[in-house]
């Protein structure tokens, strides 16, 4: 064996034996640009759990886990996510080979039930570090990007019709967005329908209008509400009924002309399989946090594709780190309904050194190794929650 070959093999062995050396995590509280009103809460601040994973070869990867309104959306709060990472996932992964993502995912899932938000932050950091080690963007590690700029909508959720219309007009004039989602379900059905109709009439000839009910309606209200939303020209209706009422969701998808988007009803590939098996015909909102990470979420996407169900890139209103991690996954898929990865735009500040670029109704996917973004250490320190 010549010297060159020995050197190459030694280099490869060093790369292959890099291990997880350290995992740090913080809760970072960033104010929003305005109150963001959903059916279950109103947000004035977003709490991001930021992770930095350091390998034995010195390469660092970053990740993020973010939920909505503390415990308003799901079973993991920022505090619980931080605790799971600190006390359970970190001891489990320290010293393990850092470049075998499937083995590490199996290790996490085998030892720790649920906690997909925390696992997603770790999976993201592992992918970021691996991409940097190989000189490849995360999208390449996930099979390769089909597109380097992805459509992104904006949510009109001030809670006031006139304000939402004015905000939509401004964004259309700027050319930043071509689709809007309305948050409804917190008020009486008639009030929500009047609010939606006014916005459709004001903006619907220039933009796609969708609504998100966030599970607020029972089956009867859902049937009535969805029929009226379809009649007024709404393009997509997201999770109108409880995540536990698959039967009603399936009926709506089969009976309403407007597409129904399942969000809270689908987190894992098995959820997607069950809903498809029951006859659901709409679309699935993919979210890396619900599935366990940018790689793990692709299993749900494959189930949807096999069943002929559309795909939509969903958000937990993440900051830039979580948003770009999602974008790398979404870029590998045909997204019939685009994405809603506007999270960073909802925040008053950004904790990365170079923000993402939003223009012409799209967001650009970074092409540099790893996620393609780096933390601004000063801002990270400034917004980190103190004990």
Language model features with spans:
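Shared catalytic-loop signature of beta/alpha-barrel
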Residues: 227, 233, 244-261, 266-362, ...
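Intrinsically disordered, low-complexity segments enriched in proline/serine/threonine
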Residues: 7-9, 242, 336
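N-terminal capping/lid subdomain adjacent to the active-site entrance of alpha/beta enzymes
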Residues: 6-209, 214-216, 220-223, 227-231, ...
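Active-site-proximal loop/turn and secondary-structure-junction residues that shape catalytic pockets
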Residues: 158, 184-188, 215-217, 241-243, ...
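Hydrophobic faces of well-ordered beta-strands that scaffold small-molecule active sites
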Residues: 152-156, 178-182, 207-213, 237, ...
């Amino acid at each position: 064996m010549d010297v060159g070959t020995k050197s190459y093999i030694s280099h490869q062995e060093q790369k292959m034996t890099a291990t997880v050396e350290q995992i740090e995590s913080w809760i970072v509280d960033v104010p929003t640009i305005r109150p963001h009103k959903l059916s279950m809460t109103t947000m004035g601040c977003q709490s991001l759990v930021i992770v930095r994973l350091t390998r034995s070869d010195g390469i660092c990867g970053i990740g993020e886990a973010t939920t909505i309104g503390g415990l308003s959306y799901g079973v993991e709060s920022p505090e619980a996510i931080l605790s799971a990472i600190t006390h359970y996932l970190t001891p489990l992964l320290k010293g393990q080979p850092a470049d075998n993502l499937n083995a590490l995912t199996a290790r996490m899932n085998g030892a720790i039930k649920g906690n997909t938000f925390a696992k997603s932050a770790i999976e993201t950091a592992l992918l970021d570090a691996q991409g940097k080690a190989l000189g490849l963007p995360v999208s390449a590690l996930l099979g390769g990007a089909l597109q380097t700029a992805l459509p992104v909508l904006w949510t009109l959720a001030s809670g006031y019709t006139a304000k939402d219309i004015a905000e939509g007009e401004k964004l259309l004039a700027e050319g930043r967005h071509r689709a809007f989602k309305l948050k409804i379900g917190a008020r009486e059905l008639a009030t929500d329908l009047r609010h939606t109709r006014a916005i459709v009439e004001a903006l619907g000839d220039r933009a796609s209008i969708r609504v998100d009910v966030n599970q607020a309606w029972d089956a009867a209200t859902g049937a009535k509400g969805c029929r009226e939303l379809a009649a007024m020209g709404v393009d997509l209706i997201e999770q109108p009924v409880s995540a536990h009422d698959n039967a009603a969701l399936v009926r709506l998808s089969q009976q309403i002309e407007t597409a129904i988007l399942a969000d809270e009803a689908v987190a894992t590939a098995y959820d997607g399989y069950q809903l498809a098996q029951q006859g659901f015909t709409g679309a699935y909102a993919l979210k890396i946090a619900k599935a366990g990470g940018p790689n793990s979420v692709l299993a749900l996407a494959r189930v949807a594709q096999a069943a002929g169900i559309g795909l939509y890139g969903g958000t937990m209103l993440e900051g830039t780190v979580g948003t770009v991690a999602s974008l790398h996954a979404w870029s590998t898929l045909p997204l019939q309904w685009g994405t809603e990865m506007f999270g960073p735009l909802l925040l008053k500040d950004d904790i990365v050194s170079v923000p993402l670029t939003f223009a012409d109704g799209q967001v650009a996917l970074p092409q540099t190794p790893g996620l393609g973004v780096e933390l601004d250490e000063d801002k990270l320190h400034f917004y980190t929650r103190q004990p």
